[in-house]
Amino acid sequence: SYKKPVEIRLLSIKEQYRKTKVFTELLQRTFNYIIQNAYDIVFISGTTRQEKIYNHIGFVKFHENVGTKEAEYMPMYLRLDNGNKVIERLARAQRINFLPGPVDLSEDVIAKLSKQLYSHRSSEFVALTKDTLAKIEGILDVKQATILHGSATLANEAIMAQLKGRNLINGLVLANGEFGNRLVRETKRHGLNIETYSVGFGESFDLDVLSDKLKSGNYDFVYVVHNETSVGILNDLDEITRIVKDNNLVLAVDAVSAVGAIKYSYKDVDYVACSSGKAFCSVAGLAIVGSNCELVPLENTPLYLDLHYANKLTSIPFTQPSILMEALNTALDAFKTDERYEKVQEKYTYMKEGLKQLNLPIMKFKEKEVSSVIITVELPESISSLNVGSSLAINNIFIHYKSSYLQERNIIQFSFININTTKNEIDYTLNILKQMIGD
């Protein structure tokens, strides 16, 4: 049975364009919309003159013809289930990815995902995990790394469990965007006594205010997001770290969207959270915690959150999927040089210049806090972010716009962590934007 039908009406092309790319491109965009909105069956009234084309696509006539002799039409349907080669080809059309996740995967990483699964207790898997941990420790510049099976949220939750286990109960959480606000909610769930230093969406933290707060002696730790993706600000972690350490406090960092996109040494922080997805350009599913302090055993905490337990067992406390570890290990090889970081910066700079030429207002930050990971465009009220995002999607251009915190502010975002995005694709995107909104 079919749960979400759609009818295509009046798909019409002027005669002189019917044997050109216009038909193919119009068909592609129509099916982009249908596929992206999860319709499962399509109905049309097809002209009898084009019956051969409809049959080739896969449409099936289900009723006698309707209309007049001069304009006779066939009621037809197309099932969007597996096995239709035309639909499969349309679905494989080139996608331009400006999302902050999921990310593009290299062919080498994709190949690892097709390997046969093998035991997480095997010598092969233990050696693979040790090698992966060593690579992560080098990239983050931390004393030790621990890998857990879960999303980046698990990495942050495990850090919070460590803070509580060390009786570091009183904390200051810094928030200037959606993910800072999320840290506030998470830390409170762990029973930590939290105060918030919150500034406006995308505003910089006043470091003098931070310093004064920490001098009060009311806190055991500080938690901050390094790259606040929701706005595209790179918080000044150098200065924040200096202030925190001047006050002999513990520093925990959510670096989920920074790691792999921005080269940075986390040697002076206590904990740093990231994941296998995002800018490491592997598949999401492995949570990563880098640490420069001793991990303590947690007797009264769910075992799944116990970093000490996982670290002691070489990050194999429970079942770990071998293909996820294989994929991550391979993806990390791209960081033997700085080329990946340079490409992120290069694409960011190129797109930013193009957006400026379209007179689109880009959210501004202090020079030191500009993030090359993502560009945030604050659209004027006359242009709907929802319309722009959905219209780009029909053209197989995927940007960040659906999150409620973006919609509330009429914001769209372009991320540059995807390895396959080219300058030609950026030019194409800018051209589509120009057609949509004008100069």
Residue ranges and their predicted role:
Residues 94-135, 139-149, 153:
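A glycine-/small-polar-enriched, mobile loop at the entrance of the PLP active site in fold-type I
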Residues 266-277:
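Conserved active-site segment immediately N-terminal to the catalytic lysine
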Residues 104-105, 277-353:
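Active-site C-terminal subdomain of aminotransferase-like
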Residues 142-172, 180-184:
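Conserved beta-loop-alpha segment that forms the PLP phosphate-binding cup at the N-terminus of a helix
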Residues 165-218:
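PLP-dependent aminotransferase-like
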Residues 1-72:
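Acyl-donor binding region in acyl/amide transferases
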Residues 205-256, 260:
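Active-site phosphate-binding strand-loop segment of PLP-dependent enzymes
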Residues 356, 360-424, 428:
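Conserved C-terminal alpha-helix-loop-beta "cap" of PLP-dependent enzymes
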